[in-house]
Amino acid sequence: MSSLNVKIQDVFDEPACERNRSKDSNARSKGCSKPLTPGAAAGGCAFDGAKIVLQPITDVAHLVHAPLACEGNSWDNRGTASSGPTLWRTSFTTDLTEQDIVMGNSERKLFKAIRQIREAYQPPAIFVYATCVTALIGDDIEAICKRAEETCGLPVVPINSPGFVGSKNLGNKLAGEALLDHVIGTVEPDDAGPCDINILGEFNLSGEFWLVKPLLERLGIRVRACIPGDARYLDIASAHRARAAMLVCSTALINLARKMEERWDIPFFEGSFYGITATSEALRQIADLLVKKGTDLEILDRTDALIAEEEAIAWKKLEEYRPRLKGKRVLINTGGVKSWSLVHALMEIGMEIVGTSVKKSTVEDKERIRQVLKDDLQMFESMSPRELYAMLSEHKADIMLSGGRTQFIALKAKMPWVDINQERHRPYAGYDGTVELVRQIDLAIHNPVWSQVREPAPWESRPATQEPLPNTRPDTDATSVGRSIRRHDAGDFVEC
């Protein structure tokens, strides 16, 4: 069995996942992916999943060993943000052609590309991604990366996650395995402290982690590594010296959190920064874990004081929206951590949840939703575009929160819509982010355009009148006039 197959089977056997533990050995070996529906979009592949997790590491050069389309279709697939380096925004690919593949030139081309990147950009590390084509022709990227690392004198990390091996979620986990095998623990920090933590599965979408990080800094807590949002290579390499960790998206990186706890005794919990209550609870749990690891008890008092102050400010800002949004019905079509954290956040201001998608949610996510909604009928695994349109057009919801792929369903139904997926341009995390989310929902629902587009069109509201058809018969008067013209005699046509 190849090393990739061994790694995949190891990822499929995840003791920290309740759904995985409930399976027998035969079902566990198949993973959590469901068969694709013929004719439907397949969604992201394993390569796409690995790229999503690792691309936000901002100072690393990400080199895709593939034909041009693999990098062209995956570049900038998440709206993450960087507070410093911009190298991650540059696209690198070996751009394999048919001739490279037929003539066996692909491995030589990869080594040359690594050397060129090192000479031109001097990155702290280079990540090399395997893809379907290069995996099928048998390119040994691990051997090439090892040789390039010895030659160039910098870390060259192989990301062995070709698209055909599985789903996007599997690619997420294989990316975490690559960090464990080649990056984390390779650098010893000289400034490790008692209040260092890791944030796992936080992608810093639209810079939203920047709304949370100042809160942690006010408590004296340092983020040793945020993986992957706005991360630096050296921060991740020294992440093994953190004292505690918070897991934001367990669907993607639960294997990374569990193995870091096993190897380096870094306890973790799963939490969310979406919503006022969820943010406060996350801060308290971080403080509790640090105290258990030996931090001064004073941090608990500081945390309670900070939470009381920030909650008072946030609730004061939300008061103007509460009467305008109370009782409004929301349909949430997303997944993962947002499927339960947004439910709680919106119910806090009096909105009613008519349904939330749990397609990408874990067993723990679903249990959290049940505790809040008390009704399994409000959770749906998947809903077809036709069903979404029917639900919105029949006014069973006042607004839909989803990603860009379903926005036109809401617009066709003439209903408000707010983007909450990775393509969005506004941050919604933390106390300030919650206020911003509520503000955007209020703007969408009360936008005057909806009352206008729902009115009948002018030609639909005008009373029908039957206009007379034009007369195509010859005019009687004109005929009589024609008949009154004098007749010509033979003399009229005599040549002059």
Swiss-Prot record:
Pathway: Cofactor biosynthesis; Fe-Mo cofactor biosynthesis. Keywords: Nitrogen fixation, Plasmid. SUPFAM superfamilies: Helical backbone' metal receptor (SSF53807). The keyword Metal-binding does not apply. This protein may play a role in the biosynthesis of the prosthetic group of nitrogenase (FeMo cofactor). It comes from Sinorhizobium fredii (strain NBRC 101917 / NGR234). Belongs to the NifD/NifK/NifE/NifN family. InterPro entries: Nase/OxRdtase_comp1, Nase_comp1_CS, NifE, NifE-like. Residues 455-491 are annotated as: Disordered. This is Nitrogenase iron-molybdenum cofactor biosynthesis protein NifE. PANTHER family: NITROGENASE IRON-MOLYBDENUM COFACTOR BIOSYNTHESIS PROTEIN NIFE. One of its GO terms (molecular function) is nitrogenase activity. One of its GO terms (biological process) is protein-containing complex assembly. The gene is nifE. The keyword Nuclease does not apply. PROSITE patterns: NITROGENASE_1_1, NITROGENASE_1_2.
